[in-house]
A protein has these predicted regions:
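Conserved phosphate- and dinucleotide-binding cores of soluble alpha/beta proteins
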Residues: 2-13, 17-30, 35, 50, ...
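Glycine-rich beta-strand-to-loop/alpha-helix junction loops that act as flexible
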Residues: 104-106
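HTH-adjacent hinge/linker in prokaryotic transcriptional regulators
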Residues: 2-35, 39-102, 113-119, 125, ...
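N-terminal active-site wall of soluble small-molecule enzyme domains
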Residues: 109-111
Length: 258
């Protein structure tokens, strides 16, 4: 039986995670770790190469080199772009003009920045270079970019300086792009250095929206941001796992599927 689109996307996301961590991956290792045939893994690598994520080599792949002046999202292809744009539009529809909001880094946050461009009198506090660049061009949106250390691969700031600055602010909304949302694991990320920023954004906001495409639902990342609870509103898209959504709703999470 052919793989479902959800299964394929999750597997390819995991391949990319390993590639970003190691810089080089082998078909034999991926086949063993992901429980897929070598032919399936090679097809995945070929597809990811076409999308611009990697360079194929004999027996595996290398992370595609990028100029050091770029950050993720500036010129990189965004996986599941249409889905993330739909989620971003749904989030933007809930943010009134005149709001103050926190935005973290991530490709869904970048899509939200694009969706917010027509808003008026927004105050946006972010640690994302791409979000700050996009919204900073809009004359009716005031942007504060948190200072601190820079993750040059993914284009976000973090560390004690960024956290100290964030402590000064309160917001109506915290909108977070994350790597996993599940009843058991809660809201999670693969970027440990950014987790403290994410937690503080939630603590200093009246409302929290988790914007995550369907591949993140039922999945658990490396570091814990917060529990799944009634304080969280989740906006995601089909074809997310109905079982995972049901389990989240049992914990009081408000889930919207666009």
């Amino acid at each position: 039986m052919a793989d479902s689109k959800l299964k394929i996307d999750i597997r390819r996301d995991r391949i990319l995670e390993q590639l970003r961590q190691k810089g080089k991956i082998l078909v034999s290792e991926l086949s063993r770790e992901l429980g897929a045939t070598p032919v399936t893994i090679r097809n995945d690598l070929d597809a990811l190469e076409r999308d611009g994520y990697l360079v194929r080599i004999q027996g595996g792949a290398l992370l595609r080199a990028r100029p050091s002046v770029e950050w993720r999202g500036e010129q990189e292809t965004i996986a599941h772009l249409a889905e993330k744009q739909a989620i971003a539009q749904a989030v933007a529809a809930q943010i009134p003009d005149g709001s103050t909001l926190f935005l973290n880094s991530g490709t869904t946050s970048q899509c939200l920045a694009n969706a917010l461009r027509a808003h008026r009198s927004l105050n946006v506090v972010t640690n994302s270079l791409a979000v700050a660049t996009e919204l900073g061009r809009q004359p009716l949106i005031h942007v504060i970019l948190l200072g601190g250390e820079i993750n040059t691969q993914y284009g976000f700031t973090y560390g004690s300086d960024a956290e100290e600055q964030l402590r000064r602010y309160q917001a109506g909304w915290a909108v977070l792009s994350v790597d996993g949302v599940s009843a058991r694991g809660g809201v999670t990320s693969f970027h440990a250095e950014e987790t403290a920023i994410d937690r503080m954004m939630i603590a200093h906001a009246k409302h929290t929206i988790i914007a995550a495409d369907y591949t993140k639902i039922g999945r658990t990342g490396f570091t814990h941001i917060c529990d799944a609870s009634p304080e969280i509103q989740l906006i995601t898209n089909s074809p997310c796992s109905p079982e995972a959504i049901h389990d989240l709703e049992l914990l009081g999470v408000s889930a919207t599927i666009v």
